[in-house]
């Protein structure tokens, strides 16, 4: 059986990042309509998510809160944070080998780090969602994060998508009406555009990163 790993929420200035793993047969994933989460509507993602839970041999995920993201971004180590939790997920879900959607501009470098950390057969790819298990993991990560964001919005009100490019998100940050623990203070948006300070990076990137 093959494992796939992907994340959701790497780039937002508000809320957690979620990394997920799915282990299963490729044919099973294709039959239930798995594809890259970005190509599915929220309703379709929810429906496929429930099917993934039924057919997969293993599904697991980790939620990484803004404070921990900030701690790594402040040292230019966002990829290292992803690698740490990806390795943990690999060790929790047995498979013959694992495909990972690489956050690093050099997938081989990221792959080597995971092989060293886990001792498992790992293949890191750009555009890993072409692998059904990675696409399934992207759906799981996205659904879990979306549910957490909806719960947060029930508590604090609408703040848009949470991404730095969203005017509604920027407005809420300017107004200072977001709980501090929900904000990624190291993002450049927080200090550069909003003037709240503690800023470092536009979207947590370092020179080895490939995604926002």
Swiss-Prot record:
Cross-referenced PANTHER family: RIBONUCLEASE, RIBONUCLEASE H2 SUBUNIT A
GO molecular function, one term: manganese ion binding
Domain of life: Archaea
Chief subcellular location: cytoplasm
Cofactor binding note from Swiss-Prot or TrEMBL: Manganese or magnesium. Binds 1 divalent metal ion per monomer in the absence of substrate. May bind a second metal ion after substrate binding.
Function: Endonuclease that specifically degrades the RNA of RNA-DNA hybrids.
The name this protein goes by in its record: Ribonuclease HII
PROSITE patterns for this protein: RNASE_H_2
BP GO annotations: DNA replication, removal of RNA primer; mismatch repair
Domain RNase H type-2: from-to ranges: 1-199
UniProt keyword annotations, A-Z: Cytoplasm, Endonuclease, Hydrolase, Manganese, Metal-binding, Nuclease
InterPro entries named in the record: RNase_H2_suA (IPR004649), RNase_HII/HIII (IPR001352), RNase_HII/HIII_dom (IPR024567), RNase_HII_arc (IPR020787), RNaseH-like_sf (IPR012337), RNaseH_sf (IPR036397)
EC top class named in words: hydrolase
Gene Ontology annotations for the cellular component aspect, listed alphabetically: cytoplasm; ribonuclease H2 complex
Subcellular location: Cytoplasm
Swiss-Prot/TrEMBL cofactor(s): Mn(2+); Mg(2+)
A Pfam family assignment: RNase_HII
Protein's organism: Pyrobaculum aerophilum (strain ATCC 51768 / DSM 7523 / JCM 9630 / CIP 104966 / NBRC 100827 / IM2)
EC number: 3.1.26.4
Reaction catalysis annotation: Endonucleolytic cleavage to 5'-phosphomonoester
Keyword Cytoplasm assigned: yes
Xref: CDD domains: RNase_HII_archaea_like
């Amino acid at each position: 059986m093959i494992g796939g790993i992907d994340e959701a929420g790497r780039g937002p200035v508000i809320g957690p990042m979620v990394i997920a793993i799915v282990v299963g047969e490729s044919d099973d994933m294709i039959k239930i309509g798995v594809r890259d989460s970005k190509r599915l509507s929220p309703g379709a993602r929810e429906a496929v998510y429930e099917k993934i839970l039924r057919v997969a041999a293993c599904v697991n995920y980790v939620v990484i809160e803004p404070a921990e993201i900030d701690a790594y971004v402040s040292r230019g180590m966002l990829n290292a944070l992803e690698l740490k939790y990806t390795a943990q997920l690999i060790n929790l879900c047995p498979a013959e080998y694992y495909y990972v959607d690489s956050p690093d501009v050099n997938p081989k470098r990221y792959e080597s780090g995971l092989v060293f950390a886990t001792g498992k057969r790992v293949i890191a790819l750009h555009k890993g969602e072409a692998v059904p298990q990675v696409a399934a993991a992207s759906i799981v990560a996205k659904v879990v994060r979306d549910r957490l964001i909806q719960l947060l919005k029930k508590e604090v009100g609408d703040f848009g998508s949470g991404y730095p490019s969203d005017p509604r998100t920027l407005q809420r940050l300017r107004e200072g009406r977001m709980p501090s623990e929900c904000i990624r203070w190291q993002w450049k948006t927080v200090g550069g555009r909003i003037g709240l300070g503690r800023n470092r990076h536009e979207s947590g990137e370092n020179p080895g990163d490939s995604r926002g």
